[in-house]
Each structure stands twice: as C-alpha cells, then as structure tokens.
C-alpha cells in the first residue's frame, strides 16, 4: 500500500481511536486519538491509556518530532530521589520538558491519516507509520491443517515505520516505544531471551514490540523517553518507565522498518478451564514474534485484500467507514478457545465483555456466514447444549401459568467466566426493564440465526436434531403469543415464568422509546421474520402442519401492525395488548403466587436492584 493510496475519506476529523486486532485472540492495539489514550489492550474493557512513542529526528538537529499519541508524565526517577520527590517535582519536570523541547508532537494539521478496514496509516513530514491488521475467514479447526490455523490465529498485528531521508544531510534516528503501565512486570529486552534472533521490547511475557535482528541498523533502549535519545555514546541502561527501539537512516536513503506487535496469554476462562486455541501452536511470545516477522509479506497481502473487501464495495464513504470500524472492533472482541479438545468460538460484547450475547450474535450473523460459517454453528451448538432452558408463561399481573417451551439465555457469561448452564450473566429475576429476562427475544434470535445458517450453508445434517426443525421453537413462540389460538396477534403477549413477578425487558435504555413496550418495538419485525423463516424451513422438509401454523402467525402480526397505520401511512406504535397497569415490584410480588418465604426473598432482591439501578451498568 503506497502512501498516496486513499482508502476511506475521513473528512476533517482524522483523530479517533481504532482497534488493531488479530483474529480469535481477544487483544487489541489501540491507537489514533491524541494523548495517552491507546496502547496494548489484553482482555481489557477499555483502552489502556498507555503512552506510545513514534517519532523521527529532525535533519541535523537533536530534536525529535513525534505523532501525538503520548501525554505529559513525570520522570519515573523522581520517585527515587529524596530532594525532589515533593509536590514541586511535577512542575520542575514540566519546565524541563518545555525548555529542552527534545520531543515535539507534530501539529495536527501536519498529519495525514489513511484508514482502511485492515491498514491504518499516519504520515507527517518524512515519517510514515502503518498498522496492519490482516483478517480473512477463520479456518474450521475440525477440517483445517495445523499450518492454516497457525497462520490465521497468529496473535499479533504488524507495523511499519518508513523514514524518507532522501533529502536529508545527516543520519536521522527514528523511534518506536511505549510506556510501561504494568504494575507487575518490567519491560525487558527480547534479544536477551532469543539468542539475538529478535530485537525489541516486551512488557512482561504478554505483550511485545519485535523486530528481526537482520532488519535493523541500530537499536537503543533508553531511560525515560528523552534521557538517552541524544546519542551520548553511553551504553543503554535498564529503564524505570519507558523503552523504545531507535533506528538510524543514513542521509540520502529511504528505509522501512518492520515490527510485530505481539500478544500472548495462553490459559484463560474460569469455570470451564479453557485455553486460547493459538497456544497449541505457540509456546511463548518469542515464538509469536519470530513467526509474525517471518510471515510479514503473506500477512500484508491478506491485509490488502481485506481492505479491498470494504473499499471496493458499493457503499458510501460513511458506510465504508462504519463497516471498517465494525470489523476492527469485532475481531478485537473474538476468542477462539479450546475446551476438552474442541473449539469454542466467543465474541465478547465490547467493553461490557459479556460472552456471545445473543442479540449481538444475530447482528453479526451475515458477516460470520460470509467469512466463517462454522462459527455460527459453533455458537448455536453451545446455546442448545448448555444455555437453553424450558419455562412456563403468564400474563402480566396474572399468576395463572400456561405452557411455555424452549428458550435461550441472553449470554454465556462475562469477563472470561462462563455462567452456570441455563443462566446468563445479565438476566435477573423479579425486576422490570433492564436486566430482566429476555426469553422471547433470545428464542427469536435462535430461530433467525439457525434458519439463516441452514439457508446459507444447506447444512441439513446439523438441522435435524435442532429445536427449529423439531418444532419446539415454533411451539414456544406461539405459546408466548396467546394460549387461545383464536386470540393470537402474531406478537408476544406473555412473560416467562423466569421473570418471577417482574416484566420482560427489551435491550434498550429506559426512556429511549417513550411509552414503548417490548411487544411494540423490538419484536414485531423480528417475530414476523422468524415465523416466515420457519414456514419455509418446514415446507422444505415436508412438515405441512407446522408450516401452516408458522405461516399463519406472520399474517396475524402483519395485520396487527398495519391496523395501527394512520391516514397517509403514518405508523402509530400502539399495538400493545390491553394489560393490567404496572404496579410497583414490591406490591406485585406480595400479590403473586409465591410462598411467604419466597416473597420475602424477592422483595429483598427488588430493594437491592433498586440500588443497583442507580449505578453504572458495569
């Protein structure tokens, strides 16, 4: 990718963080917003706020210009002195920084950014920095070769620094480094543990910036970001806070330096004792670094093809930007795990880190079916085997129970910890609104995901034992409409017994849709689509009776929706059934069918939830 190539038109605002992630490994290298806001993110829920130093020496000067991905910070040595460790040390250090002017950020109007789905590039003056995050279909571990999996699951992204010193009159130093923000591990030199094959820096044993020895001209590790960059000739020392690699580019030359930004954390996930699948092929981060550098050219070609996937699409510039961002964040949330010798595909819910959240699984369904359909089947299989359950249903305000059926949990756990079988980390009992059980929606999500998967792959063998094929999903959906077939509307009308006196909630923030209900806004279209998909499935399989029932429901739903159109086709979202007005959770529990002891427990739960609702979601 040449520096002249335009990827996506960013407009005026080019300063935003973006994820740069390998596939199925969970880590992210975040970069793009000025200041101390990016860095190495290994299973975190937010950017690590790490100083990242990428800069170049001015020609003939002892001054450096750098991309503005770092902020002011105290010299770490101040903590170890007796005379200047008081409150005045911060002011002293700031004055020294300002007077010395050793490292000066580029002005924002000097920087050009070229942003794609896989390649992100910054250019200022004679310095270009490029981050490369290749992505392609993740091979199915059940059928792929060992080398195919090693190549695809390599836990590293790549980087290039290009220094154009063709017009220079002196040798110029470029640097690439970071601030140590790990309270447990110091930054170490990679050549000390690789027999000199790799140079670079590692933060503990989990992250590293690596380069091949044959590829570099000079390396310096320096104490703080400015104490040895002037090239005093003194040997490098062990640093307190920051390290970097310095590269010399002679006058009249243009050079490109390649790096692997590597991650390694083999064993993760509580309860199920899973490990990252890539740990089958890499024993430590040094092996990751050597492999990443050896495969640089192949990975770069994959990244170029990935960029073209989005750039050549018939989308607007805004759409391309959104898709590129979504792909980056998606891969930064993915984990391919191994459990009892079998692959387990996990997609975390961004900063919330809930695992395989079902309402997101259905959102990313078409992308996964395009790139790696086996992951959809893998997720659905785990939902069926571990995170499905059966319930009864009731009308709000009425303790009478009716048959319910099969459904699925909101998620499979949170923050690398699987939840108990049949339960999510999100859903709670005996509450209204957020965090209540989302039984109907997850059932609809399962139907949509399963039917689309079968339609796209024609995997009939997988379908046969599934709830969608057996009719269990259809029975469960119509039971949640109305127990009397003559009163069905194609909408959800009953709540799950799992709400235990509470109310079913849609995954929207309270107040976003004033006066809305789950029936009104979220499930009308999705339920209609699920019924249509099941009708086709049953007809294709010769299940005429089930197909007729599935076909009747979307007709009822469409009639319910269109009956609320105003003159001129204006939609009035008020197709809610007539229901008992909401009462307080406390009074509802007291009047419910539960025993006195159970009522007492649920009232205590309600009081606790009332307090929790005032807190942030995470």
UniProtKB/Swiss-Prot annotation:
Family: Belongs to the glycosyl hydrolase 52 family.
Name listed for the protein in its UniProt record: Beta-xylosidase
Pathway stated in the Swiss-Prot or TrEMBL entry: Glycan degradation; xylan degradation
A Pfam cross-reference name: Glyco_hydro_52
Transmembrane stretches, start-end: none
Class in the EC hierarchy, top level: hydrolase
Region named Disordered: 76-100, 463-509
EC number assigned by the record: 3.2.1.37
Catalytic activity: Hydrolysis of (1->4)-beta-D-xylans, to remove successive D-xylose residues from the non-reducing termini
Keywords, comma-separated and alphabetical: Carbohydrate metabolism, Glycosidase, Hydrolase, Polysaccharide degradation, Secreted, Signal, Xylan degradation
S-S pairs: none
GO cellular component: extracellular region
Cell location: Secreted
Any GO BP annotation: xylan catabolic process
Molecular function terms, GO-annotated: xylan 1,4-beta-xylosidase activity
């Amino acid at each position: 990718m040449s520096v002249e190539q335009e990827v996506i038109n960013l407009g005026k605002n080019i300063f935003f963080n973006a994820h740069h992630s390998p596939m199925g490994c969970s880590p992210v290298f975040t970069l793009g917003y000025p200041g101390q806001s990016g860095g190495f993110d290994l299973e975190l829920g937010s950017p690590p706020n790490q100083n990242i130093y990428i800069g170049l020496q001015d020609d003939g000067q002892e001054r450096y210009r750098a991309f503005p991905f770092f902020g002011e910070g105290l010299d770490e040595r101040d903590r170890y002195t007796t005379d200047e460790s008081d409150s005045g040390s911060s002011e002293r250090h700031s004055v020294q920084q300002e007077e010395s002017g050793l490292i000066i950020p580029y002005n924002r109007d000097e920087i050009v950014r070229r942003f794609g789905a896989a390649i992100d590039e910054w250019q200022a003056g004679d310095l270009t920095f490029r981050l490369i995050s290749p992505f392609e279909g993740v091979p199915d571990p059940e059928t792929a070769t060992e080398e195919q999996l090693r190549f695809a699951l390599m836990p590293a992204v790549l980087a290039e620094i290009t220094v154009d010193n063709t017009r220079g009159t002196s040798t110029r130093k470029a640097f690439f480094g970071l601030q140590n923000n790990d309270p447990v591990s110091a930054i170490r030199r990679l050549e000390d543990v690789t027999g000199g094959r790799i140079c670079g820096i590692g933060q503990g044993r989990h992250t590293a910036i690596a380069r091949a020895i044959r590829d570099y001209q000079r390396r310096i590790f320096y104490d703080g970001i400015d104490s040895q960059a002037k090239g005093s000739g003194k040997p490098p020392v062990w640093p307190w806070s920051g390290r970097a690699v310095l590269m010399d580019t002679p006058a009249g030359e243009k050079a490109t330096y390649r790096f692997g930004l590597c991650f390694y954390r083999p064993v993760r996930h509580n309860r199920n004792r899973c490990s990252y699948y890539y740990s089958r092929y890499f024993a430590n981060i040094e092996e990751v670094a050597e492999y990443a550098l050896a495969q640089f050219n192949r990975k770069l070609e994959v990244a170029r093809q990935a960029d073209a996937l989005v750039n050549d699409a018939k989308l607007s510039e805004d759409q391309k930007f959104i898709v590129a961002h979504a792909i980056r964040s998606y891969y930064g949330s993915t984990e391919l795990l191994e459990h009892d010798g079998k692959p387990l595909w996990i997609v975390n819910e961004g900063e919330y880190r809930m695992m395989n959240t079902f309402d997101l699984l259905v959102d990313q369904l078409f992308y996964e079916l395009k790139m790696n359909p086996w992951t959809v089947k893998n997720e659905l299989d785990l939902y069926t085997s571990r995170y499905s359950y059966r319930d009864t249903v009731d009308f709000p305000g009425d303790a009478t129970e009716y048959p319910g059926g099969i459904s699925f949990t909101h998620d499979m756990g949170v923050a690398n910890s699987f939840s108990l079988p049949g339960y999510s980390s999100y859903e709670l009992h005996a509450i209204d609104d957020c965090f209540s059980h989302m039984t109907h929606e997850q059932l609809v999500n399962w139907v949509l995901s399963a039917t689309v998967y079968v339609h796209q792959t024609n995997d009939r063998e997988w379908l046969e034992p599934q709830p969608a094929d057996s009719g269990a999903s259809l029975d469960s959906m119509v039971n949640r409409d109305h127990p009397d077939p003559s009163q069905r509307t194609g909408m959800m009308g009953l709540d799950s017994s799992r709400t235990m006196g509470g109310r079913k909630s849609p995954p929207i923030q309270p107040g976003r849709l004033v006066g809305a209900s789950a029936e009104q806004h979220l499930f009308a279209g999705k339920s209609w689509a699920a019924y249509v998909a099941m009708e086709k499935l049953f007809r294709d399989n010769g299940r005429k009776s089930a197909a007729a029932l599935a076909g009747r429901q979307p007709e009822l739903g469409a009639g319910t929706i269109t009956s609320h159109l105003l003159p001129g086709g204006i939609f009035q979202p008020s197709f809610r059934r007539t229901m008992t007005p909401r009462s307080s959770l406390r009074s509802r529990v007291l009047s419910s069918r539960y025993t006195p002891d159970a009522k007492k427990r649920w009232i205590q739960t309600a009081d606790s939830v009332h307090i929790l609702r005032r807190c942030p979601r995470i």
